[in-house]
């Protein structure tokens, strides 16, 4: 899932300092060098971030039934001029309320009724029999599944169709117990691991999209794996969510050497990154990285030159949100030959950033 799909709120601070032992007439050269180094710093930070973080995409699909055409001219049918979708009520709830059809409460899923007209082969009033009712149920059920309500069911309860009203009943599927089974060699998971990851609690409406988001949060660190199993609960309409979780060794050290630098401050770049997965057992990530340039003969630069970059990063997901904190410090120096003497350019850039995004 793209990590920041809806909105992002952030604080960003850049503090660049550039120094040069040269006349002010060379300020354009100074600005050019500084711009090159700022670009190089941004590229280095982006490369490290992409290497150390991941944005897992989890997609779970519910089983839909094939859609059928609405039958015409059924042998046994009832004239229906009103179609109503209502939520299921237990017997005690029914007995405590009036039995008049006028008091039927529309379902919270009434928007799904639009699906019965999608094929344009059905309109009210209509003569509807058992086959037609099954087609209507299937269309509404598939619509609910499309929106993630994979355990919500649509049924027909006993009723008198001579009234001209057909009432379809929705049995909302709710979340039962949420369990996390830690299968790691050394248990890493805590209550916070699950609570920070899952954007739902027991008793909420079960929507597969929330489960997908929870799995993505659990798998946000590279050393963690997670899978889910839905199982019937003892309570009517509830489904237990059982998550299998496994985390490997949480510490990583990455060394690198490439030629991504500039000729002015050194093409050859060496880097070292240390990362720690699940620092607070909240699916969070921390890393620190350092990069510096090394001299080589093909740089086409004379005198003293070089660059260094140190960056810190921390991220923590919380249900449907992601908080990231980052900072970096970049320094460089370069000697440029003048007409009579050489000049030394040096610069320093510091960045601090905080961002809160909705996933």
Predicted regions and their residues:
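Sec-dependent signal peptide recognition
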Residues: 2-12
């Amino acid at each position: 899932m793209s990590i920041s799909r809806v909105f992002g709120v952030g604080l960003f601070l850049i503090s660049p300092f550039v120094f040069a032992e040269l006349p002010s007439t060379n300020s354009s050269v100074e600005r050019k060098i500084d711009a090159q180094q700022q670009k190089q710093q941004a590229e280095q930070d982006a490369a490290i971030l992409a290497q150390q973080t991941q944005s897992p995409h989890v997609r779970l699909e519910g089983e839909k039934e094939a859609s059928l055409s609405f039958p015409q001219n059924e042998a046994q049918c009832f004239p229906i001029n009103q179609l109503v979708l209502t939520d299921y009520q237990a017997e005690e709830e029914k007995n405590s309320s009036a039995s008049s059809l006028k008091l039927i409460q529309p379902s919270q899923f009434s928007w799904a009724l639009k699906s019965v007209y999608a094929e344009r082969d059905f309109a009210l009033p209509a003569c509807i029999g058992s086959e037609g009712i099954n087609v209507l149920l299937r269309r509404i059920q598939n619509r609910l599944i499309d929106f993630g309500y994979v355990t919500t069911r649509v049924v027909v309860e006993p009723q008198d169709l001579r009234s001209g009203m057909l009432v379809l009943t929705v049995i909302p599927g709710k979340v039962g117990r949420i369990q996390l089974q830690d299968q790691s060699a050394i248990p890493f998971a805590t209550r916070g691991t699950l609570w920070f990851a899952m954007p739902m609690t027991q008793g909420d409406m079960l929507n597969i999209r929330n489960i997908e988001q929870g799995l993505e949060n659990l798998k946000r660190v590279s050393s963690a794996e997670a899978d889910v199993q839905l199982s019937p609960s003892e309570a009517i309409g509830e489904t237990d969510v059982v998550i299998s979780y496994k985390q490997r060794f949480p510490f990583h050290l990455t060394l690198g050497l490439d030629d991504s630098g500039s000729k002015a401050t050194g093409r050859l770049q060496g880097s070292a990154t240390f990362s720690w997965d699940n620092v607070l057992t909240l699916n969070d990530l921390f890393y620190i990285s350092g990069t510096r340039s090394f001299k080589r003969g093909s740089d086409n630069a004379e005198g003293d030159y070089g660059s260094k970059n140190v960056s810190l990063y921390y991220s923590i997901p919380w249900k449907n949100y992601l908080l990231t904190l980052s900072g970096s410090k970049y320094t460089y120096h370069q000697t440029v030959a003048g007409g009579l003497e050489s000049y030394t350019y040096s610069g320093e850039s510091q960045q601090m950033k905080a961002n809160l995004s909705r996933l």
